[in-house]
């Protein structure tokens, strides 16, 4: 007889593009994914630019911090989702083709439906 393992959902919201906020979001997202949680990484307009190809790499080699691309890849490998609020595209002058391949551009209302039932929320 097999027991069903309960899957928990963790929501990480990032509305800033500074190193402290972004790295905190990535670290918590990777930690939650490593514990088996389904992770939703939601970036609001203030944090939108970090999902553009080449931006996360700028946070590499920060003293005492892990490699942001390692964290990003870890979350992705463990089925984490990367969601950008659609308002971030025009607000920050981003071209959709410049976003990382894994990024979904969604309305905030769609994200809220996806986040339903989450047991943990973190905002940076």
Model-derived features with residue positions:
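Short internal beta-strands
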Residues: 39-44, 82-86
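Short, glycine-rich nucleotide/cofactor-binding loops
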Residues: 10-23, 55-56
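Short beta-alpha junction loops
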Residues: 45-48, 89
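Histidine-anchored nucleotide/phosphate-binding helix
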Residues: 23-37, 41
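Short, flexible loop segments at the rims of nucleotide/cofactor-binding pockets, characterized by
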Residues: 58-63, 98-102
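A glycine-rich helix N-cap at a beta->alpha junction
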Residues: 59-86
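N-terminal beta-loop-helix "entrance" segment that forms/cooperates
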Residues: 47-62
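A short aromatic-anchored loop/beta-hairpin motif
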Residues: 74-78, 83, 92-99, 104-113, ...
């Amino acid at each position: 007889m097999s027991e069903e393992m309960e899957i928990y959902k963790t929501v990480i919201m990032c509305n800033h593009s500074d190193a402290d906020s972004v790295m905190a979001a990535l670290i918590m997202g990777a930690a939650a994914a490593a514990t088996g949680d389904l992770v939703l990484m939601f970036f609001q307009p203030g944090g939108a630019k970090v999902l553009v190809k080449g931006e996360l790499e700028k946070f590499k080699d920060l003293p005492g911090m892990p490699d942001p691309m390692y964290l990003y890849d870890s979350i992705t490998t463990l089925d984490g989702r990367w969601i950008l609020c659609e308002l971030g595209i025009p607000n920050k002058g981003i071209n959709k083709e410049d976003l990382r391949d894994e990024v979904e551009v969604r309305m905030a209302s769609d994200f809220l439906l996806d986040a339903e039932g989450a047991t943990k929320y973190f905002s940076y």
